[in-house]
Amino acid sequence: MDTSLAEEVQQTMATLAPNRFFFMSPYRSFTTSGCFARFDEPAVNGDSPDSPFQQKLAALFADAKAQGIKNPVMVGAIPFDPRQPSSLYIPESWQSFSRQEKQASARRFTRSQSLNVVERQAIPEQTTFEQMVARAAALTATPQVDKVVLSRLIDITTDAAIDSGVLLERLIAQNPVSYNFHVPLADGGVLLGASPELLLRKDGERFSSIPLAGSARRQPDEVLDREAGNRLLASEKDRHEHELVTQAMKEVLRERSSELHVPSSPQLITTPTLWHLATPFEGKANSQENALTLACLLHPTPALSGFPHQAATQVIAELEPFDRELFGGIVGWCDSEGNGEWVVTIRCAKLRENQVHLFAGAGIVPASSPLGEWRETGVKLSTMLNVFGLH
């Protein structure tokens, strides 16, 4: 049936309420309504079916089924440090939608919100961040650690409360092929983002992952842009950084799968602002696995922390002047049948009233340049700054 002009305008102008979860991917796109039960159990050791996290998750799924929810789904976010409380919940219901139709409606979206920036602060400032990078790069040249991922924030205060639904539409219009998400948080805030990185998708017994590590800025000229991608693919520094990630993931996934297929070389993928090195993993999971056991097994990958993990996180704790909390964590869903999809919480912002917190990180190895990493994180921050109309 044809949609009337009035109906089309109404659909184009509608925005998501701040208390609803939204997830859009090539695999499954849906929104939720209501909250059956919140789940803040830390995801530490969540890769084990016998862990408190998995046992309590199973109990909540059983409760939801007893109340008439046929295939309950757990949605939300897990922090960078899985020892911290999770921000998950089981909604009362969920509604799927067409990703293609949503991409089209976001392009037609005409509502806007005029916001004035009252205060803007880089955490840390450029000089301090470059000193952090230099220190981490020096450490990666020693036996202590091979790679460290360092991040920075931009904190923004606006003159009015922010409409997350309006921003979501602009985010989709500008980043239509990303994994777009809108996560309501218990404190009344929203986690909003356009992640390019799939941590884990599980459908039946099959699973996939597409880790990213190594990036280069896109160029406005088509020829120069392709040259930038080819330079990235040939970069010894970026290939080394990428291989640290893929090798670590292969080691842990081998033990939890009966099949595992990993290409010998990375490929290029793009976002509107960056080229990335990517390696697609495909496999068949062991029977006891669900989407969250595998996601917790991988999280955080060396793409978000470094390698080896324990040494890298110790350096992060020493150098970063803030707690990442949900930034650098994972966002997604897992249903009671074990299917699900989890993406890395990057290219993202946390919104609450008139406060905005933006996050970006970069992998540091011996060949890293302090100024180069400042610029790379600046390009990554531009994804969300562009959504706000800032630069």
Q: What does each model-found stretch correspond to?
A:
Residues 1-52, 156-161:
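Short Lys/Arg-enriched alpha/beta "domain-start" segment
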Residues 32-34, 39-41, 95-127, 133-134, ...:
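Contiguous alpha-helical scaffold segments within structured protein domains
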Residues 23-39, 157-240, 244, 257-260, ...:
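An anion-binding catalytic pocket shared by soluble metabolic enzymes
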